[in-house]
Amino acid sequence: MPYQYKREPLTPDEANRLASACETHQERLIVWTLLDTGLRVSELAGLTREHIDWQNHRLMIYGKGGIYGTKSKRRIIPLTDRIRPLIDGHFAIHDTIGMTPRTIQRILKRIANKAHINRPVSPHVLRHTFAVAAVQKGISLPALQRLLGHDRLTTTEIYLNLSPEDVIREFREKW
């Protein structure tokens, strides 16, 4: 199997510092949504009012894959209590997120610097952070696979770059 670069997810402390460093509604919308949903940056940038199931508090994402390169694959992502008011507030006024993927990346980099995180932080690092946090909260790999929109479980496993401390802690809890 070819070498697969593994992005390092943020530690829980780094994720908390990043979330706490957000000062504006826009910053919280970006950081908290990425941390709580595992969306790809293109999916966040492309989010519109039509993607929200208001009654059931969830997002409907039409993502990568599908036949002939179309975005026909649909997945459903629940909105956490933390991001629901941000999404509701934003889309009560706006039809779209109103930011490009590059703008989201720049804003995230600025917040990471403000939070004194001394390594690269990108939307995809937050996607990995979401995946590790989901597993640590007890979400099954097949459920995580669906949340992330992966066709293959092996793709999802790439995201689970658990630290040695995580492995030891889980072993002690379960053994």
Listing of model-derived features with the role each one plays in the protein:
Residues P12, G46-P85:
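Conserved tyrosine-mediated DNA breakage-rejoining catalytic core shared by Y-recombinases
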Residues Q4, L34-N56:
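Short, charged phosphate-coordinating catalytic segments
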Residues P2, L10-V41:
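Basic, Lys/Arg- and aromatic-enriched nucleic-acid-binding interface segment
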